[in-house]
């Protein structure tokens, strides 16, 4: 489904929170949305492998990487896993790598930057917790909508039709 965050903000301006404009699109799908699952991990993507093995239909993974752009949390292998398990998208408060591969995949990926250095894989982190970045607080179960213009968050699903 295609989302227009500008239009959604016009319609639901009192029901949505707008994430600060820190992110760029890196995935092949420039518009995505769904119910979020949160994870907090700093320069370590081991926990992401476990989460992205789950069925992701209708879901968006929101990763609080502490804003670090020293190591990439998402790479082509993780993006392929997410695509295979039908995740709608991934938002990374941090960095990604292998961007040429990412843009060929049918998944939405927004991150702060790209860097060739990969993350550790020791599974250090927590999932399904409250995370804060971009001027908003994300809870697992909230709904996120993203496109080239920005990212918005709502407690409840928005009527897109």
Swiss-Prot record:
Signal sequence annotation: none
InterPro entries from the UniProt entry: RraA (IPR010203), RraA/RraA-like (IPR005493), RraA/RraA-like_sf (IPR036704), RraA_gpbac (IPR014339)
Keyword annotations from UniProtKB, A to Z: Cytoplasm
Gene Ontology MF, one: enzyme binding
Record-level GO BP terms: negative regulation of RNA catabolic process
Superkingdom of origin organism: Bacteria
Subcellular location: Cytoplasm
GO CC, any one term: cytosol
Gene3D superfamilies assigned to the protein according to its UniProt record, in alphabetical order: Ribonuclease E inhibitor RraA/RraA-like
Family: Belongs to the RraA family.
Record's function text: Globally modulates RNA abundance by binding to RNase E (Rne) and regulating its endonucleolytic activity. Can modulate Rne action in a substrate-dependent manner by altering the composition of the degradosome. Modulates RNA-binding and helicase activities of the degradosome.
Subunit comment: Homotrimer. Binds to both RNA-binding sites in the C-terminal region of Rne and to RhlB.
Protein name: Regulator of ribonuclease activity A
Source species: Serratia proteamaculans (strain 568)
Source species taxonomy: Bacteria, Pseudomonadati, Pseudomonadota, Gammaproteobacteria, Enterobacterales
């Amino acid at each position: 489904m295609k989302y227009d965050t500008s239009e959604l903000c016009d319609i639901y301006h009192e029901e949505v929170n707008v994430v600060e404009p820190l992110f760029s699109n890196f995935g092949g799908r420039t518009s995505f949305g769904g119910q979020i699952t949160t994870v907090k991990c700093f320069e370590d993507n081991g926990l992401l492998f476990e989460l992205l093995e789950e069925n992701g239909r209708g879901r968006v993974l929101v990763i609080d990487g502490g804003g670090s752009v020293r190591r990439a949390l998402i790479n082509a292998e993780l993006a392929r896993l997410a695509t295979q398990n039908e995740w709608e998208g991934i938002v990374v408060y941090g960095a990604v790598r292998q961007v040429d591969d990412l843009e060929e995949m049918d998944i939405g990926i927004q991150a702060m930057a790209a860097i060739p250095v990969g993350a550790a894989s020791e599974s250090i982190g927590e999932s399904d917790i409250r995370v804060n970045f971009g001027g908003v607080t994300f809870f697992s179960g909230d709904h996120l909508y993203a496109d080239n213009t920005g990212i918005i968050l709502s407690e409840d699903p928005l009527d897109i039709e």
